[in-house]
């Protein structure tokens, strides 16, 4: 009897990744109101003080468990809707209007925050360490330039999937053909320290996807890098039959529970010469819409697949196990991070065999489509 490969689904994680996590655009939280964010297995409350500085606390009041995100901002504090206990951004209770004094132990958890290029980040570390400067999120030079648009931003709540599902895409060359309808003509990964890089060139499939809409050959040059466990910066150069666009895509997420996460994505676009600001914003919205459609294609797979710790791979599948080893550094204590997790690793996938097979498949699809169209015309003439 032949041996059967069984799927190992592994164990449920007991901690959330150490690192910077983007909660969204900073301006979202600067409207004078408290905002609820479900993350890291709990609920957070996010608001901005009178200086516009973002503050993040655990949302549940340490007095009687009221939800601070349902309260009000009073001065620089967030006031609980239950008994009006007021909490400052440092986690200390600042006032209890009906009490003679504030109990010395009236403290809640405050979260370290950072603002970069119009986005708000929080630092998560199960050990309680402060963020090392070498793992900070890099600046995006294009942001804030008159030559580039502002962020167009969206988010999707993903249920029934662990964050690692989206990380696996960093090394998944073949899914770009089957899920995103593109020929990957170049594909390379580099992992080092807390950064995982993907170098990708693609050509659109003429039988499916965006390339079929315009009848033009489309190409893409992409450099994507995860800085830590959850935040990817992805400069893109698209060419649609000679019309070129440059953009910077953000692909990021934060965990809600161990089997759900909030996927966020946003784009800034270089304004084409001769295009008005309004037209540039429309272009950015269209590109974001296209990215969203791509993510939804992934989401449909994630919703229906199983977790698999022992994937059976061929050589064109890329360094899945090496990527997961890199990713594991964010789920262990700092003292347990090993050289194998952070040491430099490079791998380029040979795409020749894959593209040869895919070219044949696409040619057959186009030929079949042509026959079906001709048959349809003949039937219409009868």
Curated annotation (Swiss-Prot):
Cofactor requirements of the protein: [2Fe-2S] cluster; Fe cation
InterPro entries recorded: Cholesterol_7-desaturase (IPR050584), KshA-like_C (IPR045605), Rieske_2Fe-2S (IPR017941), Rieske_2Fe-2S_sf (IPR036922)
Gene Ontology biological process terms, A to Z: cholesterol metabolic process; lipid catabolic process
Top EC class, one word: oxidoreductase
Induction entry: By 4-androstene-3,17-dione (AD).
Binding site for [2Fe-2S] cluster: 61, 63, 80, 83
EC number: 1.14.15.30
Pfam short name (any one): Rieske
Ranges where the Rieske domain occurs: 20-122
Residues annotated for Fe cation binding in this entry: 169, 175, 180, 298
Coiled-coil ranges per UniProt: none
Any one GO MF annotation of this record: iron ion binding
Signal peptide: none
UniProt cofactor note: Binds 1 [2Fe-2S] cluster per subunit. Binds 1 Fe cation.
Catalytic activity: androsta-1,4-diene-3,17-dione + 2 reduced [2Fe-2S]-[ferredoxin] + O2 + 2 H(+) = 9alpha-hydroxyandrosta-1,4-diene-3,17-dione + 2 oxidized [2Fe-2S]-[ferredoxin] + H2O
CDD domains: Rieske_RO_Alpha_KSH
Subunit: Homotrimer. The two-component system 3-ketosteroid-9-alpha-monooxygenase is composed of an oxygenase component KshA and a reductase component KshB.
Function text: In vitro, catalyzes the introduction of a 9alpha-hydroxyl moiety into the ring B of 3-ketosteroid substrates such as 1,4-androstadiene-3,17-dione (ADD), 4-androstene-3,17-dione (AD), 4-androstene-17beta-ol-3-one (testosterone), 4-pregnene-3,20-dione (progesterone), 23,24-bisnorcholesta-4-ene-22-oate and 23,24-bisnorcholesta-1,4-diene-22-oate.
Identification of the protein by name: 3-ketosteroid-9-alpha-monooxygenase, oxygenase component
Protein's organism: Rhodococcus rhodochrous
Gene this protein is translated from: kshA
